């Protein structure tokens, strides 16, 4: 079973997994178009969140934020470089939202991507629990986000998550999707953005930037205190980045206003 699309039509996943067909059109198998990208998002999310959770659970007191910041950033850059050509390398519902808004992901794939990322988050967190000593796991609350302890911290944490995720989503959308600015260093830039964000924002909000990263450990450790912050903040940032690129900083093909005549 396969479908046919015009050569100029954007792909949902890997734009290289195509075969020439009759009349100058491309034939893409349903598996490569719909299923494979979702499997890759699940796999990449699981690997990234496993490494991230383990780095928090096994973090020593002498390393502070440096160990989780480097582990998250390097792991994300690695999985993007390895798997990004298949799915776009989002591994984050907020990034998928921003990518969809600027034309980097078809709308019909947004929900499947989200489901895949959340399942990957649960799998990665469960694997981190499986390989960790029980005492360390519970001392770290299963790598769930526990930075916000009281109502007075909520506003600062929410604003921090919006700003931190904006930087990350900009790194993805401008570095890997926008035609005028994308380049081969995108995986490095995206991973570096995560590292910088955690180092800077960790004491304020935990530096999540990713609902799947928050959701997986929350399920496994059953820790839901102030969990909504790590959904609302990143998703608002995804909307903001989509608006910025569509209206102001995107290339001529992406921008909806202020086009040259």
UniProtKB/Swiss-Prot annotation:
It catalyses: H2O(in) = H2O(out); H2O2(out) = H2O2(in); formamide(out) = formamide(in); methylamine(out) = methylamine(in). Keywords: Cell membrane, Endoplasmic reticulum, Glycoprotein, Membrane, Mitochondrion, Mitochondrion inner membrane, Oxidation, Repeat, Transmembrane, Transmembrane helix, Transport. It comes from Homo sapiens (Human). Residues 58-84, 129-156, 205-228 are extracellular. SUPFAM superfamilies: Aquaporin-like. It is a multi-pass membrane protein. Channel that allows the facilitated permeation of water and uncharged molecules, such as hydrogen peroxide and the neutral form of ammonia (NH3), through cellular membranes such as plasma membrane, inner mitochondrial membrane and endoplasmic reticulum membrane of several tissues. The transport of the ammonia neutral form induces a parallel transport of proton, at alkaline pH when the concentration of ammonia is high. However, it is unclear whether the transport of proton takes place via the aquaporin or via an endogenous pathway. This is Aquaporin-8. A motif (NPA 1) lies at residues 92-94. The modification Cysteine sulfenic acid (-SOH) is found at residue 53. Sulfenylation at Cys-53(C53-SOH) when hydrogen peroxide flows through the AQP8 channel, making it susceptible to hydrogen sulfide produced by CBS. Persulfidation at Cys-53 is required to gate AQP8 channel; under stress condition, hydrogen peroxide accumulates in the cell leading to CBS activation that produces hydrogen sulfide inducing persulfidation of oxidized Cys-53 (C53-SOH). It is found in: Cell membrane; Mitochondrion inner membrane; Apical cell membrane; Basolateral cell membrane. Induction: Regulated by osmotic stress. Up-regulated in response to metabolic acidosis. One of its GO terms (molecular function) is urea channel activity. The keyword Aminoacyl-tRNA synthetase does not apply. The keyword Membrane applies. Reversibly gated by a two-step sulfenylation-persulfidation process in cells undergoing diverse stresses. Detected in the sperm midpiece (at protein level). Expressed only in pancreas and colon. One of its GO terms (biological process) is B cell differentiation. One of its GO terms (cellular component) is apical part of cell.
